Amino acid sequence: MGLCSSKPETRDDEPENHVEFSAGNVHLVTTKEAWDEKLAEASRGGKIVVANFSATWCGPCKMIAPFYSELSEKYPSLMFLVVDVDELTDFSTSWDIKATPTFFFLKEGQQIDKLVGANKPELQRKITAMADSVAHDHRI
């Protein structure tokens, strides 16, 4: 399981390696207002939110991004978000992010689960369980 706990020192003349974090059905959140809008939209639709707090410089974040995108397409009953911890530093700090990637699972704006690190099998397991619970809730 990989994770990054601090930003590496880079020289100013080095181009940053940007990864496409918002592919598939993944929504890139760039403001607190956009976060609030997405959570409200998910609550209205009865969707569970999977929020990936990530960083462009983090190797494990880059590694898990395509898998996260695949999951977003496989489970459209969930809302998949990604937050760049460097773009929304204060907001990320308010979520007590100690390492990236950190995945939060939210229902009606409240945290119901959390996963720290790029652990594909565990992420798959948690997302499948969340999707199953949403499907079960809609059948009742």
Predicted segments — roles?
Residues S22-V26, W35, G45-V49, P76-L81, ...:
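Core residues of folded domains in eukaryotic genome-function proteins
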Residues T30, F53, I64-D90, I97:
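Thiol-based oxidoreductase modules, predominantly thioredoxin-like and allied folds used
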Residues K38, F67-K74, F91-S94, Q111-K114, ...:
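Alpha-helical recognition domains of nuclear gene-regulatory proteins
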